[in-house]
From Swiss-Prot:
Protein's name according to its UniProt entry: Meiotic driver SPOK4
Domain of life per record: Eukaryota
GO biological process: meiotic drive
Example GO molecular function: DNA nuclease activity
GO cellular component: cytoplasm; nucleus
The keyword Cytoplasm is assigned to this record: yes
Annotated gene: SPOK4
Coiled-coil residue spans: 4-41
Compositionally biased intervals (Basic and acidic residues): 181-190, 457-468
UniProt entry tagged with the keyword Nucleus: yes
Keyword list, A-Z: Coiled coil, Cytoplasm, Nucleus, Toxin
Localization per record: Cytoplasm; Nucleus
Start and end residues of each stretch annotated as Disordered: 180-230, 414-499
Function, in words: Promotes unequal transmission of alleles from the parental zygote to progeny spores by acting as poison/antidote system, leading to poisoning of progeny that do not inherit the allele. May possess DNA nuclease activity that leads to spore killing, and a kinase activity that confers resistance to the nuclease activity. Can suppress meiotic drive by the P.comata SPOK1 protein.
Organism whose genome encodes this protein: Podospora anserina
């Protein structure tokens, strides 16, 4: 081989070696990049990274079905409250959202607190595998793509001590699976939720100067939103922060959302078109008008929920958009709306999304939640007072606001398609500015009642036939109860508020002594109020006690009566109330239920009668049943009409209580021996009573009564002697459910062993 060939060969080998080296380096770089990518995808993410991932992998994963295959039909809103005006929620857009977004960004910083990108990618794949064509599909999408991330971010804020206190960031959850507590168990779930003509007629016939005597004062339709934002109170208990509803994406057409929500008189136009039953001949105009009708009805439904559940905040979730809503309690007739359309506002993905991440659905809903936490939900007397104002101020679909024409709106028969389209590419601007409040958005106290209506010539609408005397004054009193006293010194208004129960619960021994006619219990925290003229006896007997409670609640269902917790302290058919009997200071609880569930409370009363000698020890002291003629209002416009009076049983046993199950079995054995099968193994029905040092059992509405075991044994001894019975022959006369308990008791207690002749 010549030198030239040798050199050529060496050069070729050198080049091959360099190529292999470069290839190895490239492979190493690729492996390193892949490793870094995997590490990046599997490590937790920062706040901004998480927002980007949620939008890219979850929100953009939504796939909609062809509208021809989607659910059809209008939202049922007949008889529901709707606002007169729709205005942009500029305070949220310009003040609240920027403030809260900056707050969350500051608290989270660059800490890696949230789900890895791989998790959101995998979930996004699952979302994209299912087409969404109805509310149920949107429900699943909203939970995965929006609600779960929002809840995770709020959880981080709740653990931040400074932010938790300063901005009232509590523990929070979306409750989208509400039990239908307002319907009887056997009631058809497909019942129409519209108000009947009879209900509307009764509502219209209600006298303006009469005190409310029944729930017929209001619209009596079943109101059950798709979901409620539930926040945990610092001192325990839960309350609603906002209401939300899911809508199929095609029912809130995103191409018409901005133009429709920019129309101040959207509701009037839609109601007028429906009442006149007039359709445009232009197909394009028809599509727009139908889209506006769908949007107006979706907004009306949530607005009605906001009013009747006593909250100022709500939203409509329709997949491609969120409609964030707010109503000021100083102006019930105006609904403020912020349309959130992330696909348009965020745009196509780029390398740097930082300046647009605040427009994502998750970011905007976080700010919405934080805004709602600054407002207290109305309940009890304040809710009823507010609804009195709403009833006098608002119209129900499809009644018309008589004075809308005087605001400069053309009658529907004179309006043209062109005039209706003027707002399609513009945003509404009104001379009447939004309130501009930054956080609380509450009414200002003054020496005069706040005006229900905005300034102008709108007062002609509400004459004597539609208003109630003192409604505004009552509302001021309600506001003061919820928000605390002001510096205005409205002593007269504050005096209008019914006193709430404030004392500790009476002891079991105290209320048992009252029922049995025995001496006072000196250990009762309220014994000084029970004692009259230095006597050691109770000032009233059990019958007089029940009658006095009834008379006190007849004057007002809110006098000395307060619902403990609508969302937490509730059973299968009732809610828990704390009561105080004035002036004797007896403090106890009531189990309240709806008018059509009286039979279940009566059954529970019969169970307590069977367990009479166990009252105050194994079960609470039963003090009778009363009717509230006026009814105690609940969120959603239902009324507690009947209430069973009892002693307070105690608290749920702590998880660290080692012998809780043993004590529970002892109490179950005790009631079983009296012929009662509890029939409800819910943990909330077994409470630790420190006074008696045992587990007390409550809620007997599902209990089954059977002859006590002792009575059976005596009955068998009195019969002629026949062939010797075995335990199995004895059990053939008992139901299968009873048999299981008998077997257990035969193993534990001689009292449960059946007697045999011979």
């Amino acid at each position: 081989m010549s030198d030239k060939d040798r050199i050529t060969q060496l050069l070729r080998k050198l080049e091959e070696a360099k190529a292999r080296e470069e290839e190895a380096k490239a492979r190493e770089a690729q492996e390193r990049c892949e490793k870094e990518r995997l590490q990046l995808e599997h490590r937790k993410t920062t706040f901004l990274e998480y927002l980007r991932n949620c939008h890219r992998h979850l929100y953009n994963a939504l796939r909609l079905t062809d509208t021809s295959r989607s659910s059809t039909g209008y939202t049922k809103v007949v008889g529901k409250y709707y606002p007169k005006r729709l205005r942009p929620w500029t305070n949220f857009t310009n003040v609240l959202h920027p403030r809260y977004f900056d707050l969350v960004q500051k608290i989270c910083g660059q800490r890696q607190l949230f789900e890895p990108a791989s998790t959101t990618k995998n979930l996004g794949t699952i979302i994209s595998d299912h087409l969404a064509g109805n509310e149920k599909a949107i429900d699943r999408f909203e939970v995965d793509a929006v609600e779960r991330p929002v809840q995770g971010i709020l959880k981080v804020l709740a653990t931040h001590e400074e932010a938790g206190k300063a901005y009232r960031c509590p523990e929070f959850r979306f409750s989208a699976n509400l039990r239908e507590l307002t319907q009887e168990d056997d009631r058809s779930s497909g019942a129409d939720d519209n108000t009947s003509d009879g209900s509307l007629e009764r509502r219209q016939q209600a006298g303006p100067n009469k005190r409310p005597t029944s729930k017929r004062k209001y619209i009596c339709s079943n109101r059950q939103p798709d979901g409620v934002g539930i926040r945990m109170q610092p001192g325990g208990g839960q309350t609603q922060a906002f209401i939300y509803d899911y809508k199929a994406a095609h029912k809130v057409a995103i191409e018409h959302v901005r133009s429709a929500t920019a129309k101040e008189h959207l509701f009037h136009e839609v109601v007028a078109r429906i009442n006149d039953d007039k359709l445009s001949r232009d197909e394009e105009v028809q599509r727009r008008e139908q889209a506006e009708a769908f949007i107006a009805m979706a907004l009306t439904q949530v607005f009605d929920y906001m009013i009747t559940y006593g909250v100022s905040y709500g939203y409509v979730a329709a997949g491609r958009c969120l409609l964030l809503l707010y109503v000021d309690r100083d102006d019930w007739q105006t609904l403020y709306c912020h349309p959130c359309l992330p696909a348009d506002d965020v745009g196509e993905p780029t390398n740097d999304w930082t300046d647009r991440l605040s427009h994502t659905a998750v970011a905007q809903l976080v700010s919405f939640c934080l805004s709602s936490f600054q407002s207290e939900a109305l309940e009890g007397q304040s809710l009823e007072t507010a609804l009195s104002v709403a009833k006098a101020t608002l119209k129900t679909w499809s009644e018309s606001y008589a004075d809308v024409a005087y605001l400069g709106l053309e009658p529907p028969e004179l309006s043209s398609a062109a005039s209706s389209q003027n707002t399609e590419n513009s945003e509404y601007t009104s001379e009447a500015k939004p309130t501009g409040r930054k956080v609380a958005l509450r009414s200002q106290s003054s020496c005069k009642p706040a005006a229900v209506l905005p300034q102008g010539n709108e007062h002609d609408e509400h004459d004597e036939d539609h208003s109630e005397p003192g409604a505004s004054r009552s509302r001021l009193a309600a506001n003061k109860r919820k928000r605390g006293p002001s510096s205005g010194g409205e002593d007269e208004d504050i005096a209008m508020a019914d006193p709430e129960p404030t004392r500790q619960y009476c002891t079991q021994a105290c209320l048992l002594g009252l029922k049995r006619g025995k001496d006072l219990d000196e250990n009762c925290p309220n014994v000084s109020l029970h004692r009259f003229d230095g006597s050691s006896r109770h000032p009233v007997n059990a019958h007089r006690f029940t009658d006095m409670v009834k008379q006190q609640l007849l004057l007002s269902p809110y006098k000395g009566c307060r619902m403990v917790d609508f969302w937490d302290k509730r059973g299968a058919m009732g809610w828990l109330f704390k009561l105080e009997l004035f002036p004797y200071g007896y403090t106890f609880v009531g189990k309240g239920t709806l008018e059509d569930r009286l039979s279940r409370l009566e059954h529970e009363g019969r169970v307590y009668a069977r367990l009479d000698h166990l009252q105050g020890d194994v079960v609470p002291v039963h003090l009778g049943l009363v009717r509230l003629d006026r009814g105690y209002i609940l969120p959603g416009l239902e009324f507690v009409v009947y209430m069973m009076l009892m002693s307070w049983a105690g608290q749920t046993p702590s998880a660290s209580m080692a012998d809780a199950e043993t004590l529970k079995r002892e109490s179950l054995t005790a009631i079983w021996s009296e012929g009662v099968d509890h029939g409800d193994d819910n943990r909330a029905n077994y409470l630790w009573n420190a006074e008696r040092c045992r587990i007390m059992i409550i809620d007997f509405d599902r209990a089954h009564l059977f002859p006590p075991l002792k009575a059976r044994a005596v009955s068998r001894l009195s019969k002629p002697k026949r062939k010797r019975e075995t335990p199995n022959s004895y059990l053939t006369e008992i139901t299968g459910r009873e048999a299981r308990y008998v077997f257990k008791q035969m193993d534990r207690s001689p009292r449960a062993t059946p007697s045999h002749g011979g």
